[in-house]
Amino acid sequence: MNYIVIVAGGKGERMGNEVPKQFLLIGEKPILMHTIERFHEYDKTLKIILVLPEEQQNLWKELCSKYSFTIEHQIVNGGTTRFESSLNGLSQIPEGNDGLVGIHDGVRPFVSVNTIKRCYDEAQLTCAAIPVMPLTESLRIVEKNGNSKSVERANYYNVQTPQVFNIMMAKMAFAQPYQESFTDDATVMEQFGCKISLVEGNQENIKITTPLDLKLAEILINEKQPKD
């Protein structure tokens, strides 16, 4: 059996808004509902685990009632770090399950179904897969002495979610002590010794964290389904 852990722990501070960013409206309903719908569209048998701060859970339930949102999902308390939140989600998966689990940012509602499929298909073959997109702007690295130099853009990618892993390997990897070098879930797996496979993401799969992102999201939601 396959799972998706959707981590939604934002507080909306960078938005300058008291409403948690995952609850902000685009297309007349909360961002988080669009995100969950995308995975349900990919696979209606996928088990959905929503990781949400405890103090936000009553509001979420009220929103589900208000917007008649009925896609089945399990709610789990968020942690103080992304690592802890992902771990809390993984802990709800029964032991001995040899399926796949994706971990996804709750504020990425425009991930395409084909991107999701590519991640799960590749992880089935290789144990760990993440979606990436090539960079389009030039890069420079700043050295300790303050000097900078250009770096080869082709060697770098923007990393997206969902990041999909073998469940048993993910549970073992997240049993490691937390390290500050864990910038995302894939780095936890990498530290454990898993090779990370890269698959093509989709350009619209933005993480909505700033007012500008929200404006872009409002444009995207009024267009047709995300391109692959």
Name each model-derived stretch.
Residues M1-N58:
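N-terminal glycine-rich phosphate-binding loop and ensuing alpha1 helix
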Residues I6, F23, L32, G89, ...:
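Residue-level signal for inorganic ion chemistry
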Residues Y157-D228:
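Conserved alpha/beta core of the MobA/IspD/sugar-nucleotide pyrophosphorylase nucleotidyltransferase superfamily
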Residues Q57-W60, F83-S86, I116, V132, ...:
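A general structural signal for well-ordered alpha-helical segments in protein cores
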Residues M33-D98, P177:
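Conserved N-terminal catalytic core of the sugar/cofactor nucleotidyltransferase
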Residues K149-V159:
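A recurrent flexible, glycine/aromatic-enriched loop bordering the glycosyltransferase active site
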Residues T80-V142, G146, Q160:
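Conserved beta-loop-beta/alpha segment of the NTase-like Rossmann-fold superfamily
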Residues L46-I48, L100, A128, K195:
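Residues at the starts of beta-strands that form the adenosine-phosphate
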